[in-house]
From Swiss-Prot:
Transmembrane helix found in the keyword field: no
Catalytic activity annotation: NAD(+) + (deoxyribonucleotide)n-3'-hydroxyl + 5'-phospho-(deoxyribonucleotide)m = (deoxyribonucleotide)n+m + AMP + beta-nicotinamide D-nucleotide
NCBIfam families: dnlj (TIGR00575), PRK07956.1 (NF005932)
Domain of life: Bacteria
InterPro entries: BRCT_dom, BRCT_dom_sf, DisA/LigA_HHH, DNA_ligase, DNA_ligase_AS, DNA_ligase_CS, DNAligase_adenylation, DNAligase_N
Domain called BRCT: residue spans: 594-671
Protein name, entry field: DNA ligase
Positions of the catalytic residues: K119
PROSITE patterns: BRCT, DNA_LIGASE_N1, DNA_LIGASE_N2
Biological process (GO), any one: DNA replication
Cofactor: Mg(2+); Mn(2+)
Source organism (scientific name): Polynucleobacter necessarius subsp. necessarius (strain STIR1)
């Protein structure tokens, strides 16, 4: 409650009526939710609690006596032959147990059967079929009447325009949910971002916004889906199956899509087990849900239980803990990832989201902060799904305080004080102190020791973890100062392993300039670029002193790579580590290419297992001879060198007519 909210009960009740009316108008009519569902539910339950104490205050205009918003004026209005009511919600197991007890008491039944199904987070729809043909589709609206969205519904491929069965009722109103699969939503948002168009906040908003387009051509481009789960008008009534589960099976026979995640439940224990089962798999479902629904399975028993003014007495929605909640941004810090990525993180007033107390949420990058206009002091909606890091979804701007502060991205790394860089066309800013930064230390060491870099056998992730955690190694240069005793004392190391690692470290001093450059971990500098740089500059110091214009003269080095190299080399911390490495006895050979006229300028692709060498060794031989080794087969490929167990690359080569040779033939070309 804000500081100016009413305090006495009557005033609080009036405030809730007005506030909920405002929120419902925004949600149902304007399609612009102002609060997460959990916040709306909390306010609505508070209203019901007050009415339970003061039933004399309830009038026909009370929000508890109707379902919600009116139809948009731009669409024709459709009156529902059978009202589209919402469901009562349960948030605690005790409420579910009470629901089961009431049903059994009214029906004088010892045991009940319930149909358990998912509660989708989309838009409720009624489809009216007459003699098997889809004639009208309408939104829920206020429950009594909704919007005619027939033209838009007909664009959804999951919804049949004609039912496929001989025994089709004259009139059948199918109730269900229009929604968007997560993969479709993410793809649509990616495409929108690429075109510079507005992105949707979540799949529910995307589905609702798409369905309520006045131009059905726009809706046709949106990846909407549908699941059937209920029944409206029906003629003749004799068509009606005996149970809800049988109805859904009949829908499937008619060609209607029905969710397979459902089950008939025969006790409270089975109901709670179903709730837990769906909760466990919730984060792996391909669509958003916010709970499960239980319906008395027998239609005869449903009729006996009847309806309240707002919801049926035979059904209940069992909600999961909110995956979105409101809280306040107390501050914005930046974190440095293992690759140097600088990620802004909002420090939040503690809030319960998805059953977990959240105090921090990612803001992704500087552009995202600007796009969402997140400021220190703002009230924000925070979302958490499964193991995904909590994120700030949106800002509640009408709650922004006058003293809210804009965020400024720091220019220096908070861990090592190296300068922060952001290259052209990249959303992520990064710390430039790759060889020195404590946050990047482990990743830098693992890359440095890689077999394609310095090739330090035995220096894997677990050893690196111990070396860094025990402060034995801070930079790659420290590896060459390690003593036998320090290594032998590491967990699961032993004297023999320590001796072997010392030998591997010493052997790595004899390497090539190209491998050394690659081992430094300069962003955008891979093996091939490292070889080109080594061939061009012939020494490490020459590369360290190269400017952007000079770098651009190197084969395949463009502006992004040149900027990355100069940024790395200009950082004093990195230069210091390189000098320490060179002073440790490095002997960096410059490999001379022995150009072979038969392969120079040719493109090779390697696949399968070779009899006398690894693919990496074959690649080195070809590149030294002036050939290029690619990772995939195309029409531009000159040769595919195939060993045993060659896979799809061999098939592709045969399809394209690319010459296929074996290792022996390759060696003949290199002579």
């Amino acid at each position: 409650m804000s500081s100016n909210s009413p305090t006495n009960l009557a005033e609080r009740y009036a405030f809730l009526q007005a506030e909920l009316a405002r929120l419902e108008h925004a949600y149902y009519v304007l399609d612009n939710p102002l609060l997460p569902d959990i916040e709306y539910d909390r306010l609505y339950r508070e209203l019901l609690d007050i009415e339970a104490v003061h039933p004399e205050w309830v009038t026909s205009e009370s929000l508890s006596q109707r379902v919600g918003g009116a139809a948009l004026k731009e669409f024709d209005s459709v009156t529902h032959a059978v009202p589209m009511l919402s469901l009562n919600n349960a948030f605690e197991d005790a409420e579910l147990i009470a629901f089961d007890r009431r049903c059994r008491e009214v029906l004088h039944a010892e045991h009940m059967a319930y149909a358990g199904e998912l509660k989708f987070d989309g838009l409720a729809i009624s489809l009216r079929y007459e003699n098997g043909l889809l004639v009208t589709a309408a939104t829920r609206g206020d429950g009594a009447s909704g919007e005619d969205v027939t033209a838009n519904i007909k664009t959804i491929r999951a919804i049949p325009l004609k039912l496929t069965r001989k025994n089709i009722p004259q009139v059948l109103e199918v109730r269900g949910e229009v929604f968007m699969y997560l993969k479709d939503f993410e793809k649509m948002n990616r495409q929108a971002a690429e075109l510079g168009e507005k992105e949707f906040a979540n799949p529910r908003n995307a589905a609702a916004g798409s369905l309520r387009q006045l131009d059905s051509k726009i809706t046709a481009k949106r990846p909407l889906s549908f699941f059937a789960y209920g029944l409206g008008a029906l003629e003749p009534q004799s068509w009606l199956p005996k149970t809800h589960e049988e109805l859904l099976n009949a829908y499937i026979e008619l060609g209607l899509p029905v969710c397979s995640e459902r089950k008939v439940l025969h006790s409270v224990q089975e109901i709670l087990a179903f709730y837990s089962e769906i909760d466990d798999k919730r984060d792996s479902l391909p669509y958003d849900i916010d709970g499960v629904v239980y319906k008395v399975n027998s239609f005869a028993e449903q009729a006996k239980l009847g309806f309240a003014s707002r919801a049926p007495r035979f059904a209940l929605a069992h909600k999961y803990p909110a995956q979105e909640a409101l809280t306040t941004v107390l501050g914005i810090d930046v974190q440095v990832g293992r690759t140097g990525a600088i990620t802004p993180v909002a420090r939040l007033a503690p809030v319960e989201v998805g059953g977990v107390t959240v105090t921090n949420a990612t803001l992704h990058n500087e552009d995202e902060i600007k796009r969402k206009d997140v400021r220190i002091g703002d009230t924000v909606s925070v979302r958490r799904a499964g193991d995904v890091i909590p994120e700030v979804v949106s800002v509640i701007k009408d709650r922004r305080p006058a003293d809210a502060k804009e965020f400024q991205m720091p220019s220096r790394c908070p861990v090592c004080d190296s300068h922060i860089e952001r290259l052209a066309d990249e959303a992520v800013a990064r710390c430039s102190g790759g060889l020195f930064c404590g946050a990047q230390r482990k990743q830098a060491l693992i890359h440095f020791a890689h077999r394609r870099a310095m090739d330090i056998e035995g220096l894997g992730e677990k050893i690196v973890d111990q070396l860094v955690d025990q402060n034995l190694v801070r930079t790659p240069a420290d590896l060459y100062r390690l003593g036998f005793t320090a290594l032998a004392n590491l967990e699961r190391m032993g004297e023999k392993s320590a001796d072997n690692l010392i030998k591997a470290i010493n052997q790595s001093r004899n390497t090539t300039l190209a491998r050394f450059i690659f081992a430094l971990g300069i962003r955008h500098v891979g093996e091939t670029t490292a070889k080109d740089l080594a061939n061009h500059y012939q020494s490490m110091h020459a590369l360290m002193d190269a400017g952007v214009e000079d770098l651009l003269t190197v084969k395949d080095v463009g502006p992004v790579v040149a900027d990355s190299i100069t940024s790395f080399m200009q950082e004093a911390h990195n230069r210091e580590v390189i000098e320490q490495l060179l002073a440790s006895g490095m002997r960096l050979a410059v490999e001379e290419k022995v150009i072979s006229a038969a392969v120079a300028g040719k493109t090779f692709v390697l696949t399968g297992t070779f009899p006398t060498m690894t693919r990496d060794e074959a690649k080195d031989l070809l590149e030294k001879a002036g050939a290029k080794v690619a990772g995939s087969v195309s029409k531009k490929t000159d040769y595919v060198v195939a060993g045993t167990d060659a896979g799809s690359k061999l098939t592709k080569a045969e399809e394209l007519g690319v010459p296929v040779i074996d290792e022996a033939a390759m060696l003949d070309l290199l002579k």
